[in-house]
Amino acid sequence: MSGVWGAGGPRCQAALAVLASLCRARPPPLGLDVETCRSFELQSPEQSPSAADSGTSVSLLAVVVIVCGVALVAVFLFLFWKLCWMPWRKKEASSPSSANPASETLQSPSSRGNMADKLKDPSALGFLEAAVKISHTSPDIPAEVQMSVKEHIMRHTKLQRQTTEPASSTRHTSFKRHLPRQMHVSSVDYGNELPPAAAEQPTSIGRIKPELYKQKSVDGDDAKSEAAKSCGKINFSLRYDYESETLIVRILKAFDLPAKDFCGSSDPYVKIYLLPDRKCKLQTRVHRKTLNPTFDENFHFPVPYEELADRKLHLSVFDFDRFSRHDMIGEVILDNLFEASDLSRETSIWKDIQYATSESVDLGEIMFSLCYLPTAGRLTLTVIKCRNLKAMDITGYSDPYVKVSLLCDGRRLKKKKTTIKKNTLNPIYNEAIIFDIPPENMDQVSLLISVMDYDRVGHNEIIGVCRVGINAEGLGRDHWNEMLAYPRKPIAHWHSLVEVKKSFKEGTPRL
């Protein structure tokens, strides 16, 4: 029978397959022999074409499923190794350092007793104290010292906080935060065995002692004051000759001048000016190698008596140097020639020589009045006149005008100007400048008065400035306080012009 099934070509095989499918149908078709169908059902699976095809497909499917399962298992194992195994190994590697405190707490009583004996030993305490005083450059703490400190803290229940420097910085905070084994040094108590002085002594490594800086600043101030006082004194006399209308200045002597030479002495002489005229300059003789020269020389300045109130006496003391520039020792400026007497008779005057590195330049003076109305909140500054201004043009004159700036906390809020006076060093203005300032803001503002020289080409130049206000200095503050003390009343004063300071410097655009 097997030979019958296996014989034939492809057409026979196809016919047999159709016949086999018809025999498997339930119920079988009419006209189909039952015996023939049984013979088809009893054939071996190897000889059935459909059975062979189905077996092959099942085997391929099984192979694919097995391969996919193996791949999934491999992926699962890889993820488990990455996510669980590696972090666990790292944690296990770092566990000995973290397990030290637990192992230290399980020590035997004998080891604790030995450690307590070490703490009672003065030498051991000295070593322990030195180790606890942590340096900013050496943050590592020995393991033995840390263990002994922890055991000592466990034994003593009473804790005494150690005094530390009150001022803290970010450096100290970051230093404590990055310690590998944190230990609160400020809470360590060494017990009653240590003397009180040692227990209360703060850490000395890396400390900043403010008292040293304070002492240094005080010493610096003392040095400056000593330098200002070490310029010595000068003695001179004044007398006015009414017949010849001449002011007679007699330079008598100087005392305790500073040494300017390497040998410890000086070669002093004195220059005399009657300001604002600097063209007329008189000078004493040079006295060699002395710090206490005696001059005893007379100098005559022809000046009318009515002009004496507007003149200033300027004395400059120099050290003569043959091969280089002469060094200035100091200066004396007498603003009021009638300070000592009416000049009808000779009067001797002693003055301290003020330290200076260069001769002061006389920039002139300005006269203005201040008047404040509290009810209206109105401040009126009246520019009256100027005198003896510095010549800024090549012609020997200036074209001055006055600019007044209202300042608040260093910022300029408003500015106003007067008219320009051409070719004069003694202009007269009589012009009022008004600012609206509430009474509650009067202690926050100040006025900066600038005398300017107008230039048709280029920038306008500053001749000099002065300032009045609650934060001003000298006459500027006194004038402001007098205005506030006498409201509704104009208060007029002369103010000397000074050079522009960096804090007052501002742009000067053309008009």
Curated annotation (Swiss-Prot):
Ca(2+) 3 binds at residues 321, 324, 327. SUPFAM superfamilies: C2 domain (Calcium/lipid-binding domain, CaLB) (SSF49562). Residues 81-511 are cytoplasmic. Ca(2+) 4 binds at residues 393, 399, 453, 455. Residues 483-511 are annotated as: Necessary for cell membrane association (isoform 2). Binds 3 Ca(2+) ions per subunit. The ions are bound to the C2 domains. Residues 92-119, 157-182 are annotated as: Disordered. It is found in: Cytoplasmic vesicle, Secretory vesicle, Synaptic vesicle membrane. The keyword Phosphoprotein applies. Gene3D superfamilies: C2 domain (2.60.40.150). Keywords: Calcium, Cell membrane, Cytoplasm, Cytoplasmic vesicle, Disulfide bond, Membrane, Metal-binding, Phosphoprotein, Repeat, Synapse, Transmembrane, Transmembrane helix. Ca(2+) 1 binds at residues 261, 267, 319-321. The cysteine motif mediates homo- or heterodimer formation via formation of disulfide bonds. May be involved in Ca(2+)-dependent exocytosis of secretory vesicles through Ca(2+) and phospholipid binding to the C2 domain or may serve as Ca(2+) sensors in the process of vesicular trafficking and exocytosis. May mediate Ca(2+)-regulation of exocytosis in acrosomal reaction in sperm. This is Synaptotagmin-6. The gene is Syt6.
